[in-house]
A protein has these predicted regions:
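Conserved donor-binding/catalytic core segment of Leloir-type glycosyltransferases
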Residues: 4, 221-239, 246-247, 397
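A conserved catalytic-core segment of Leloir-type glycosyltransferases
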Residues: 39-107
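Acidic anion/phosphate-binding donor-loop and adjacent secondary structure
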Residues: 48, 65-71, 210-226
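Nucleotide-sugar-dependent
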Residues: 236, 240-243, 293-300, 307-329, ...
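Nucleotide-activated donor-binding/catalytic signature segment of Leloir-type glycosyltransferases, i.e.
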Residues: 256, 260, 267, 272-298
Length: 418
């Protein structure tokens, strides 16, 4: 197959969404298919690009991407800039339809149409909404099947942030685009069911998964001293509340001051974490370490005694299956999750004894005490072990998606050939 894979997020941009799309490209290329990636130019770094003779990467200009800061700054300045940028982003997002990737979308569409290369299928991974619009138009232009990979839901998402009038517009346009697709993919059963009901199209679940190769040279080699907890990624005060966990740490130290613990946060500046550190007098044990590249993030996860996963405590989170969950599975360290306790992520952790899922600070304190005492006694914290982990690899999930694509488009290709 000649596959046109569309997403503005792609390495070297260090995002979980870019990891998912890059692994699709890599695995499909390994399977012998020609993959052309249509993405954006970006000054971002931190994630290794896939290199394979069957992959070609085509980048269209994106004015928004060029505005991203690339130079390091002092921590206080970086926090201020991050807060300002986030506010400006939210404001701009509300004024531009369908989203801030609109200019990139036009450039990407022109770039693809000016080329003589012709795909057998167009696969668009979204959001943003623009990626779906570009995919829809190019599939029509080339008269080939169209497939949508919903990493997140869009107009039907619980995260939808705009008003009623715009919501009606987005719903109408997305309905038209989604019903054009031969296949819809998404990351969990609950989201797949929503898509099926909304758009009445064939749907497949393609988990984010993890890549065992990312961890093959990484080992858990515990260092003497405190129990070390690591969090990698965004901390959003409105959706990923660190409060229950940090209050659990505070409670542990109040009840068992002799125990040693160290908590490190890596990622964009987490203002709410810094505020709570001060309020709870946790400066001695909780630190913000800044942003790191993807390879370093994986190493930090593998070296930690346990990992912290912050998700939204809301029923709308039921079907959200972050790629970070699977990286943590690959690291084989105990997971401490806060958020919606009936979500698919919570079920994966609870049903497979991969750690603890709770928003109760007392339970968190008790669990941390168990881990700290285990390390004190044995010199390490045992990994949970997960016999079924192979089902959750990127290879397996990418092949599953590829099989579904081939099955979905086969009748259309035969019809077109006839």
């Amino acid at each position: 197959l000649r596959i046109l894979l569309i997403c503005p997020f792609f390495p070297p941009e260090n995002k979980i969404s870019a990891v998912r799309v890059a692994k699709f490209a890599e695995n499909w290329a390994e399977a012998g298919h020609e993959v052309r990636v249509l993405t954006r130019e970006t000054p971002a770094t931190g994630l290794a690009e896939p290199h394979h003779s069957n992959i070609s990467i085509h980048r269209a200009q994106d004015p928004f991407a060029r505005l991203a800061p690339t130079a390091p700054a002092r921590l206080a300045k970086r926090r201020r800039l991050f807060a300002i940028a986030r506010a400006l982003y939210s404001r701009a997002l509300s004024l531009v339809w369908p989203d801030l990737f609109r200019s990139w979308g036009k450039a990407a569409q022109s770039l693809a149409m000016d080329d003589t290369w012709r795909p057998d299928v167009v696969v668009a991974s979204g959001g943003p909404f623009t990626a779906l619009r570009v995919g829809s138009k190019l599939a029509k232009n080339f008269d080939v099947p169209f497939v949508i990979d919903y990493r997140d839901l869009l107009a039907t998402s619980t995260y939808y942030q705009f008003g009623a009038l715009r919501h009606r517009l987005d719903m109408a346009v997305e309905n038209r685009i989604a019903r054009q697709a031969s296949l819809l993919a998404t990351v969990s059963d609950p989201l797949a069911e929503e898509l099926k009901i909304s758009y009445d199209r064939p749907t497949v679940v393609v988990l984010n998964g993890y890549d065992p190769n990312d961890f093959k040279n990484l080992r858990y080699e515990p260092k003497p001293g405190p129990l070390r907890i690591v969090h990698c990624g965004w901390v959003r005060p409105d959706r990923r509340d660190p409060g229950p966990f940090l209050r659990g740490v505070h409670q542990l130290l109040q009840e068992s001051p002799e125990l040693e613990i160290e908590v490190d946060f890596y990622g964009p500046p987490p203002g709410t974490v810094l505020r709570l550190i001060s309020e709870l007098n946790l400066e001695r044990v909780v630190s913000y370490r800044g942003q790191v590249n993807h390879a370093t993030s994986l190493a930090l996860q593998a070296e930690a005694d346990a990992l912290l996963l912050l998700l939204w405590n809301d029923p709308g989170e039921r079907g959200v299956f972050s790629g970070k969950v699977f990286e943590y599975v690959g690291a084989d360290r105990p997971i401490i999750m806060t958020g919606y306790e009936s979500s698919v992520a919570a079920e994966l952790i609870s049903q497979n004894d991969l750690g603890i899922v709770t928003n109760d600070s007392q339970r968190i304190a008790s669990y941390l005490r168990e881990l700290a005492n285990e390390k004190l006694t044995t010199g390490k914290v045992a990994g949970p072990g997960f016999p079924e982990a192979n089902e959750y690899t990127r290879d397996v999930q990418s092949q599953h998606f590829l099989n579904a694509i081939e099955s979905a488009i086969s009748p259309e290709r035969h019809s077109s050939a006839g």
